[in-house]
Amino acid sequence: MNTVHVNVVTPDGAAFEGDARMVIAKSVTGELGILPKHIPMVTPLDVSVLKLRHEDGGRTLIAISGGFMEVRPDTVTILAETAEMADKIDYDRASAAKVRAERRLQDTKLSELEFRRAELALKKAINRLSIRDMKE
């Protein structure tokens, strides 16, 4: 078998469990492609779209809001704050969140912490919306 078992877990429980030929994830230092028998590693993940390529040529797209990835030769475990499958994303809600975050960022009275939170909210909304353009 030329696959790696993938588990995507959030505080709410398992978001995905299955096998993939390749896992493409964005760490805080850049994009990583994980194949079966990869050397063990742990890396922090950025807000991004996790891409799983399957043996049948299909793919699974999952919007994650950061977290950590543990890689073993036969297993990849993603621990994420949130994880949404592409077909479960409410794009109207994500668009509204983007508009709210953009408005908050225009407020000149925000503290540094509030500004960073608004930036993160915008990044998450843009990430969720970006999957729509990636769908086949």
UniProtKB/Swiss-Prot annotation:
It is found in: Cell membrane. Disulfide bonds: none annotated. Pfam families: ATP-synt_DE, ATP-synt_DE_N. It is a peripheral membrane protein. The keyword Phosphoprotein does not apply. Keywords: ATP synthesis, Cell membrane, CF(1), Hydrogen ion transport, Ion transport, Membrane, Transport. GO terms for molecular function: ATP binding; proton-transporting ATP synthase activity, rotational mechanism. GO terms for cellular component: plasma membrane; proton-transporting ATP synthase complex. Belongs to the ATPase epsilon chain family. Produces ATP from ADP in the presence of a proton gradient across the membrane. F-type ATPases have 2 components, CF(1) - the catalytic core - and CF(0) - the membrane proton channel. CF(1) has five subunits: alpha(3), beta(3), gamma(1), delta(1), epsilon(1). CF(0) has three main subunits: a, b and c. NCBIfam families: ATP_synt_epsi (TIGR01216), PRK00571.1-3 (NF001846), PRK13442.1 (NF009977). This is ATP synthase epsilon chain. It comes from Exiguobacterium sp. (strain ATCC BAA-1283 / AT1b).
